[in-house]
C-alpha cells in the first residue's frame, strides 16, 4: 500500500472489497447534513421567529428572495431525503449485524434521536396550521410525566400555552442542534473507522481489502449524484410532495384540523403512540419505538453476524419492514375502526421483532449444530 503522503494514505484507506451499495448511505447522510446546514443558514437569514411574522417571512422567502424558493424547497425535501437515507441505513445495520459494533450503533441511535428532535422543531417554524397543532399535541406528551410533567411543559412553552416564546426557543433549538449532530457524526465516523466497516457476509474483511479511493469513492459519488438528482426533480416538478395541505394556512389556535399528524417520517412513532389509549403508556411506547434499537447489540444470539444466510431471521426482518410501512400508513388515517386495530396489531408485531429475533438466533444455532 503506497504511503507517500498523509492525505494520499487517507484516500487509500483499506476497506473490505465486498461492501455493497447499502454501505453508501453513510456518505449520502453526510451530504444531506451539509445540504441542510447550508440551506438552513440562508433560510435563517430571512426568517423571523415571531408568531405574527413567521408565516409571512416564509412566504417572503419563497416569493421575494432571489432563488429563495430553491433554498426553501431543498431544505424541506432534504429533510425527507435525510430520513429516507437514515431509515435505510438503520435497516442495513439490522440486516447485516452492524449493530455488533456497539459504540457505533449507540452513537448512531443518539444521532437518530437528535435528528428527530431537530426536524420536529423545524416543522413548527413556518407557523402553519399543522405546525401549530402538531407542536401542541407532541409537547403536551410531557404532561404524562408524573409530578414534573406540567412544570416541564410550561417551561418548554415559556408560558401556559404555545405562543411567541415557544416559537423563539424552538428556532434557537433548531439552529443549535445541527451543530451537535455534526459533532456526534464526527464521533460516529471516528468510532467506525477505529474498528472498520462490517460487510454483507459479516466476516472479517482483513484478508481481502482494497483502497477506498477510487473503488468505493466512485460508488459513493454515483449514489450521491442519484440522490441530489432525485431531490432536484422533486423540487422542480413536485415541490409540495411531502408537505401537508393544512400547513398552507396560517396557524389558528381557534380552529382544530380534522386530523392532526406530524411529517411522514414521524408517522410510525406517532402511529404507535395513538395505538395505546393511555397517555403515559402511549408516550412510553413512542420513546421505546426508538430506544428499542439500543437493545439489538445485547440480544444478538446467533453465531452468524449477518442475516445473509439466516432465512428464518430474514422473514422476521422483512415482516418488520412491512410493519413499519403499515404503521406509517395507518397513522395517516382517522382514529376509528379498522385503523385502530391495524395500528395496535402492527405495533405489537414491531416490538415482537426485537423479542423473537434472539429466540430465532438460538433456533438457528441448534439447527447448525445438528447439521454439523
Swiss-Prot record:
Component of the ubiquinol-cytochrome c reductase complex (complex III or cytochrome b-c1 complex) that is part of the mitochondrial respiratory chain. The b-c1 complex mediates electron transfer from ubiquinol to cytochrome c. Contributes to the generation of a proton gradient across the mitochondrial membrane that is then used for ATP synthesis. Gene3D superfamilies: Cytochrome Bc1 Complex, Chain C (1.20.810.10). Heme b b566 binds at residues 89, 188. This is Cytochrome b. It comes from the Eukaryota. SUPFAM superfamilies: a domain/subunit of cytochrome bc1 complex (Ubiquinol-cytochrome c reductase), Transmembrane di-heme cytochromes. The cytochrome bc1 complex contains 3 respiratory subunits (MT-CYB, CYC1 and UQCRFS1), 2 core proteins (UQCRC1 and UQCRC2) and probably 6 low-molecular weight proteins. Keywords: Electron transport, Heme, Iron, Membrane, Metal-binding, Mitochondrion, Mitochondrion inner membrane, Respiratory chain, Transmembrane, Transmembrane helix, Transport, Ubiquinone. The keyword Ubl conjugation does not apply. GO terms for biological process: mitochondrial electron transport, ubiquinol to cytochrome c. It is a multi-pass membrane protein. Its cofactor is heme b. Heme 1 (or BL or b562) is low-potential and absorbs at about 562 nm, and heme 2 (or BH or b566) is high-potential and absorbs at about 566 nm. Belongs to the cytochrome b family. One of its GO terms (cellular component) is mitochondrial inner membrane. InterPro entries: Cyt_b/b6_C, Cyt_b/b6_C_sf, Cyt_b/b6_N, Cytb/b6-like_sf, Cytochrome_b, Cytochrome_b_C_euk/bac, Cytochrome_b_N_euk/bac, Di-haem_cyt_TM. The chain crosses the membrane at residues 25-45, 69-90, 105-125, 170-190, 218-238, 280-300, 312-332, 339-358. A ubiquinone binds at residue 193. It is found in: Mitochondrion inner membrane. Its main location: mitochondrion. The keyword DNA-binding does not apply. The lineage of its organism: Eukaryota, Metazoa, Chordata, Craniata, Vertebrata. Heme b b562 binds at residues 75, 174. The gene is MT-CYB. Binds 2 heme b groups non-covalently. GO terms for molecular function: metal ion binding; ubiquinol-cytochrome-c reductase activity.
Amino acid at each position: 500500500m503506497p504511503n507517500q503522503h498523509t492525505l494520499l494514505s487517507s484516500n487509500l484507506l483499506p476497506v473490505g472489497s465486498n461492501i455493497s451499495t447499502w454501505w453508501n448511505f453513510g456518505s449520502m447522510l453526510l451530504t444531506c447534513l451539509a445540504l441542510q446546514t447550508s440551506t438552513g443558514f440562508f433560510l435563517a437569514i430571512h426568517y423571523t421567529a415571531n408568531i405574527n411574522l413567521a408565516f409571512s417571512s416564509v412566504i417572503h422567502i419563497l416569493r421575494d428572495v432571489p432563488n429563495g424558493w430553491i433554498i426553501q424547497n431543498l431544505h424541506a425535501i432534504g429533510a425527507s431525503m435525510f430520513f429516507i437515507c437514515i431509515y435505510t441505513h438503520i435497516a442495513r445495520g439490522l440486516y447485516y449485524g452492524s449493530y455488533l459494533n456497539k459504540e457505533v450503533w449507540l452513537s448512531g441511535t443518539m444521532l437518530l434521536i437528535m435528528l428527530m428532535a431537530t426536524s420536529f422543531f423545524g416543522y413548527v417554524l413556518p407557523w402553519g396550521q399543522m405546525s401549530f397543532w402538531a407542536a401542541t399535541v407532541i409537547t403536551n406528551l410531557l404532561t404524562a410525566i408524573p409530578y414534573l410533567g406540567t412544570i416541564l411543559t410550561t417551561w418548554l412553552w415559556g408560558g401556559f400555552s404555545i405562543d411567541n416564546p415557544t416559537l423563539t426557543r424552538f428556532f434557537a433549538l433548531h439552529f443549535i442542534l445541527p451543530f451537535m449532530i455534526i459533532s456526534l457524526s464526527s464521533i460516529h465516523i471516528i468510532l467506525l473507522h477505529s474498528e472498520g466497516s462490517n460487510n454483507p457476509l459479516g466476516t472479517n474483511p482483513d484478508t481481502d481489502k482494497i483502497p477506498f479511493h477510487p473503488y468505493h469513492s466512485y460508488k459513493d459519488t454515483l449514489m450521491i449524484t442519484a440522490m441530489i438528482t432525485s431531490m432536484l426533480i422533486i423540487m422542480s416538478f413536485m415541490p409540495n410532495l411531502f408537505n401537508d395541505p393544512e400547513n398552507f394556512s396560517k396557524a389558528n389556535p381557534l380552529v382544530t384540523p380534522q386530523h392532526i399528524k406530524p411529517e411522514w417520517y414521524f408517522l410510525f412513532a406517532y402511529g404507535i403512540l395513538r395505538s395505546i389509549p393511555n397517555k403515559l403508556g402511549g408516550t412510553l411506547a413512542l420513546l421505546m419505538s426508538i430506544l428499542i434499537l439500543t437493545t439489538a447489540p445485547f440480544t444478538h444470539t446467533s453465531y452468524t453476524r449477518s442475516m445473509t444466510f439466516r432465512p428464518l431471521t430474514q422473514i422476521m426482518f422483512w415482516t418488520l419492514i412491512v410493519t413499519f410501512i403499515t404503521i406509517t400508513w395507518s397513522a395517516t388515517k382517522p382514529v376509528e375502526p379498522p385503523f385502530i386495530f391495524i395500528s395496535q396489531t402492527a405495533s405489537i408485531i414491531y416490538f415482537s421483532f426485537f423479542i423473537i429475533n434472539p429466540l430465532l438466533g438460538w433456533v438457528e444455532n441448534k439447527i447448525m449444530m445438528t447439521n454439523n
